[in-house]
Amino acid sequence: MWKNIRVACLLLVLLIVVINAYRDQNQDWNQPINILLHPINADGLPTTEKYIQQLQQNDFAEVKQYLEKNSQQYRGQSSYFMIQMGRELDQTPPKMSEQPSILNNILWSLKFRYYAWKQHESIDGSPSLTLYLNYYDPKNTKELKHSTALERGRIGSVNLFAAHKQERQNNVVLVHELLHGFGATDKYNLANGEPLFPIGYAQYDKRPLYPQTEAEIMGGRIPLSEDKSKMPNDLEQTVISLLTAKEIGWVQ
């Protein structure tokens, strides 16, 4: 019985997804873009909770400025981004399967949409995109698992460190997933995380090619050699490439 109820709920979410698919793939960049952020104490630690309680909307001002600056560059006029701090949530989004497959990915996608539907309250309004920020104390969690986002559904699950010294690097991860939500694709090798040449390079025509000094935002890392790279320290060390701008609709 409970299995049938769960299947029915997932089918309902799938129907909603189909109805909203057209809207989600046709973002009007002339309208204000409202990004809703829901912080989550993902490791349940008091130190993480203390960090979340100190978070302010202004902590994400760099994200807003970065997006507006780059939209101005490609569109000839700036899109207006509103970064809204939402409610802290108790439940983390569903995690992707450790054994990826087409079926597992589809099931995870439906579960994630169902999670987002259950978490939404009227006070949240109708955001253009919702990101669930899963915070972890870096003293307890040394390495974060891969963040994910869905264009069809305009939702993302972003894993971040609960530390002020990590905030600018957190913003790099946040913008990467945010752009995923608007249709940008990964530009790195999924097997090893290294940026793909040339689409994952910010300076693909640089001579000598290495070391690079910037990261393409969807490439994720700064290439130092053919098989070595590093995480950018902040958004100032990243660029949005023409290809990424086309994918999200800033360039026709």
Where are these regions (language model features)?
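Acidic/His-rich structured neighborhood in mature extracellular/periplasmic domains
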Residues: 88-172, 189, 193
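Metalloprotease/metallohydrolase-associated module, dominated by Zn2+-dependent proteases
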Residues: 1-5, 10-17, 147-151, 156, ...
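Active-site recognition of the HExxH zinc-binding catalytic motif
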Residues: 169-187
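Stable alpha-helical elements in mature extracytoplasmic
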Residues: 59, 63, 170-174, 231
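A mature extracytoplasmic/lumenal domain signature
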Residues: 39-41, 135-137, 162, 186, ...
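Propeptide-to-catalytic entry region of secreted or membrane-anchored zinc metalloproteases
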Residues: 2-10, 15-124, 135
